[in-house]
C-alpha cells in the first residue's frame, strides 16, 4: 500500500524564512524521492526559471496521519543540484564535518506566542491582561490560554520521535516554550524546524496562529527568544571549566556577526530589560539571565558542562546559530591548540649499520 510523505522546506521570505510543505504519495517500499516545487511562489526563483529541487535529508513518522506516513525535511537545491542561496543547512553540514572532533552538542529553547484575530491568544479584545508575573509556569483556566495546543504538539513530537525535552508557559500571557536537544550541529536544526512545522500545523486545527517574532508586543512585555545551549566534549569532560570560559571569551570576539544573524528584530528584544543583555554589550556570568551568555549554576559547581547563549531570537534559523557557534568556539579552540610533541622517526636499518633516527618536529596547526 502507498503512504503519504509530507515534504517540508524553508522558503525565501525575508527577513524571516517561513515553512512550506506539500504531500506526495509514495509507493510502498520506496523511499521519498527527490522532488521539486515552484520557487517563484516561495520567493526562491523568478517566473521564467522557477524550478527548485527538494532533497530529503531527515525523515520521521508523521504523528498526524497514518502509521506508515512520514514527515520529510528537505534541503532546497537549484536546478543544477547546487545548494540554493536560502539553503543554510549545507553550510552547517560543512562546519560540522570540519569540527567533528570537538563533538559539539546543542539544546535550543524555542519560545513562541499564540495569536488569534491579531492579538495574543487569550488577551482581552480591548486593553491588556494583568501584568506579567503569574503566567510563567503557571496554572489556571484564565491565565494559561493555549495549553490544549501545547499538549497536542508535545504528544505529536514524541510520536514523531523528535528529541523534545519539555515545555513550559512563558512570562507573557499567550507565550510558551518547548525545548529540543541534546543533538548534534545539523540534527538540532533538522528537528527544530520539523517541530516548528508541527506546532504551526496543529495550531491551524485550533484556528490559532503561531508567532516567532522577537518582540510580538511592544512595551513592558517579554520578547521571545531561542536560548541556545552548547557544549563540546572538552566542556563536558572532567575539568571542562577552562573550555567553557574559553568558549564564552570566543563568543565575545565576534559579537556583531552573531547579532546580525541571530534573527530579525533582535535590537527590539535585547534592550537590557526583560531578562536580556543589551545587544551592543557582550557579557557572560554564572546564573545571570541578564548576561549575553549564561553559565548555569550547576555547571559552575561541577566545573564542567555547557554554556547558554541567550541572544538568539525565537525566529532564528537553528542551522545558522549552530554553524556560527561551532565556527566561533571550536574555531578558536582549534587555533590555540598546542603543537603536537615531536616524535622520533626511525630510519630503516641496513645490513651494514642502523642509521640513527632523527627527531622531526610536527608542524604547528594554522
Spans of model-derived segments:
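Glycine-rich, acidic/polar active-site loops that bind/position phosphate-bearing ligands
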Residues: 1-341, 366
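Low-complexity, polybasic segments enriched for Lys interleaved with small residues
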Residues: 339, 343-364
Amino acid at each position: 500500500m502507498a503512504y503519504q510523505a509530507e515534504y517540508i522546506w524553508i522558503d525565501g521570505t525575508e527577513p524571516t524564512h517561513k515553512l512550506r510543505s506539500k504531500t506526495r504519495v509514495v509507493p510502498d517500499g520506496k523511499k521519498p524521492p527527490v522532488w521539486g516545487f515552484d520557487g517563484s511562489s516561495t520567493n526562491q526563483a523568478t517566473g521564467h526559471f522557477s524550478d527548485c529541487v527538494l532533497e530529503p535529508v531527515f525523515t520521521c513518522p508523521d504523528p498526524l496521519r497514518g502509521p506508515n506516513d512520514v514527515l520529510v525535511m528537505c534541503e532546497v537545491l537549484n536546478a543544477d543540484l547546487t545548494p540554493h542561496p536560502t539553503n543554510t543547512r549545507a553550510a552547517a553540514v560543512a562546519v560540522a564535518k570540519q569540527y567533528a572532533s570537538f563533538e559539539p552538542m546543542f539544546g535550543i529553547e524555542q519560545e513562541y506566542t499564540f495569536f488569534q484575530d491579531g492579538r495574543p491568544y487569550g488577551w482581552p479584545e480591548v486593553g491588556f491582561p494583568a501584568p506579567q508575573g503569574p503566567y510563567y509556569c503557571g496554572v489556571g483556566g484564565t491565565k494559561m490560554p493555549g495549553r490544549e495546543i501545547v499538549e497536542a504538539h508535545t504528544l505529536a513530537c514524541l510520536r514523531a520521535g523528535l528529541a523534545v525535552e519539555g515545555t513550559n508557559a512563558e512570562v507573557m500571557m499567550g507565550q510558551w516554550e518547548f525545548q529540543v536537544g541534546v543533538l548534534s550541529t545539523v540534527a538540532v536544526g533538522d528537528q527544530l524546524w520539523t517541530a516548528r512545522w508541527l506546532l504551526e500545523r496543529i495550531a491551524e486545527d485550533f484556528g490559532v496562529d503561531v508567532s516567532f517574532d522577537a518582540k510580538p508586543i511592544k512595551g513592558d512585555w517579554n520578547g521571545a527568544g531561542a536560548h541556545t545551549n552548547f557544549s563540546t566534549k572538552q566542556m563536558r569532560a572532567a575539568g571542562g571549566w577552562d573550555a567553557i570560559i574559553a568558549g564564552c571569551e570566543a563568543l565575545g570576539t565576534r559579537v556583531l556577526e552573531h547579532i546580525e544573524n541571530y534573527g530579525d528584530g533582535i535590537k527590539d528584544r535585547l534592550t537590557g530589560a526583560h531578562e536580556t543583555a543589551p545587544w551592543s554589550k557582550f557579557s557572560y556570568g554564572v546564573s545571570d539571565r541578564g548576561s549575553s551568555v549564561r553559565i548555569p549554576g550547576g555547571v559552575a559547581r561541577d566545573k564542567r558542562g555547557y554554556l547558554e547563549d541567550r541572544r538568539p531570537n525565537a525566529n532564528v534559523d537553528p542551522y545558522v546559530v549552530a554553524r556560527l557557534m561551532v565556527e566561533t568556539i571550536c574555531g578558536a579552540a582549534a587555533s590555540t591548540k598546542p603543537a603536537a610533541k615531536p616524535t622520533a622517526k626511525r630510519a630503516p636499518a641496513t645490513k651494514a649499520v642502523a642509521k640513527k633516527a632523527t627527531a622531526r618536529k610536527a608542524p604547528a596547526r594554522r
